[in-house]
Amino acid sequence: MGTASRVTYWCGKLFVYCVAASLPLFAQEPATPALNSRTQSSDTKKNYLVLDIVVTDKSGNAITKVLEEKDFSVLDSGKPEKIIAFRAIAGEALEVQPNDPPVKIILMVDEINTSFSKVGYERIQIAKFLQQNGGKLSHPVSMGYFSDKGIEVDDDSTRDGNVLLASFDQHVTALRSSKESAGFYGTVERFQRSVNALNSLASKESHLPGRKMIIWMSPGWPLLSGPGVDLSYKQRDGMFATIVSASTALRLARITLYSVDPVGVENADSSAGSLYEEFLKPVTVAKKAQAGNLALQVLARQSGGLALRASNDISNQLNRCLADADAYYTLAIDPAPADNAAMYHAVDVKVVPGLIARTRDGYYVQP
C-alpha cells in the first residue's frame, strides 16, 4: 500500500470513528412554543416545524414595517403548507409572551480553532463590541467559551457590556496545546472536539423554550474533505446519519447559528476561508455525504444564520449578527410524518415582493 493510499485509508477510518462518536441521534423534543392561541388546543403536537425568520430587503437591510401572517407563505419541498401559528417580534414594540421568552444570545469564543497569534486582536474587538454605547447592548448576551475544558457558558445574560467584559477579562484563556505539527491526528482531534461541543450545546438548549442565537467566533473547524479522503459506502452512511443528527439537533433546540471569523482581512483573497461554500448544498442521500457538510459555516448558513469573514471590524460583524434579534417572525407548520428512511425537505418561505426571508433552508424527517 503506497503512502497516498495509507493516508486515504487512515483518514477514512479515523474520521468516521470520530464523527460517529460525536453526535448521537436526538430523540428529545422541545416544548412547542406558544406562538398564538391556535397552538394551545388539546391536539397540539410536538412535531411542528418552527421557523424563526428574519426579513430584509434585497440589499440585506432590515425593514421597519411589521408584516402580518398574510404576507408569508411556506413551501415544503415545493408544496404549499398551511401556517398553523404565527408571531411577529419587532424589538420591544411587541410584548413577549410568558411561554416564549426573549431570544437567548450566546457569544461563543472558540479557543480550540483560533490560532494564538489572533487571540490578542480578537480580545480587543470583543472588548470594543461590549463597550459600545457606554456598555449598553441592544439585547441581553451571555458569554461562552470553547476550550480544552469543553463548553462553558455564563449562567446569566445581561445588556451591561461592562459586566460581560469583566467576566471576559477574568476568563483564563485555555488555548489548546499546539498541535500544528501533529498532522492529521491533531486535525481530527480538533474536529471531534468541535462537533462534540456543538452537540453538547444543542442538547442542553433543546430543553429550554424560545429562540436561541449562538454567535461562534471562529475561523471554523477542519473540513477534513478533499481528494485524500475517500469514504466507503458504509462510512458515508455513518456520515449521513451524523449530518442528519446535527441538523436535527439545531432545529429542535431552535438554534440559529452564526460564525464570525476573527482572522480578518488577512486571508480575504485566500480560497481557504470560502472553501466551505462547496458544501452548502444540503445532503439528500448518503452517497454524497462529506465531512465538509458539517463545517461551522455550513451549519450556520443552513440554520438561517450568517457566516461572516474577511473584515478587520469584528465588532461590526458581531453587531450584524445581533441585529437579527431586533425584529423577526416565528411561524409553524405541521409537516407530514416520514414513511421511510431519513428524507430531506427543502423549506422556502416567501414574503411580499421586494423582500427576502432568511430562515432554516430545510429539515430531515425520520420514520
Regions found by a protein language model. Name each.
Residues 12-24:
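Bacterial N-terminal signal peptides
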Residues 8, 15, 360-362:
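Small/flexible residues
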Residues 1-10:
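N-terminal secretory signal peptides that target proteins for export/translocation
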Residues 4-5, 21-22, 28, 32:
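Intrinsic disorder/low-complexity segments
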Residues 28-367:
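Scaffold/interface architecture of coatomer-like assemblies
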